[in-house]
């Protein structure tokens, strides 16, 4: 093999190894960031809490959703927030939307009806936040406390930042993901979702420029 061919092959291998190392570093940092910031709480009073949707069954919130709702109610009772925006639709027309389930639960726990806002169209985190932001704008709200599970917070706050929301983190102090059997799968799910979202941002920005 000629020297120049050897050097080209070496460069290709070096570039490939550099790409692999960069990917490993990026994934490792993302994993560390999600894990280390999971309990980061911003002690800031805001106009409203945005409760990210989760499953509801037969008009009752799932254990995961219930903990999110309870935390928002706690913030409301402490005076840290003035209103609560519940988010989430439903997969099936016959089922009650997640946001309506959450509202019914909050009303039973002495949250005033006029202090509850809902959006019932979203099914995913990004849409939860975008729709809630529009509800807030329509009701003259400006600052928000994002409420969700600890491992969900990093991605939620990254999305909130990208859409220009003045938002602060308040992860639930308790979670249905208590054991390694439930917490580890949820962690890796969030890691994949976070990486997917972050890596999609350059393409999203390019599309916005083209528009």
Locations of regions flagged by a protein language model:
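A transmembrane-helix-recognition feature enriched in membrane-embedded lipid enzymes
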Residues: 180-206
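N-terminal type II signal-anchor transmembrane helix
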Residues: 4-41
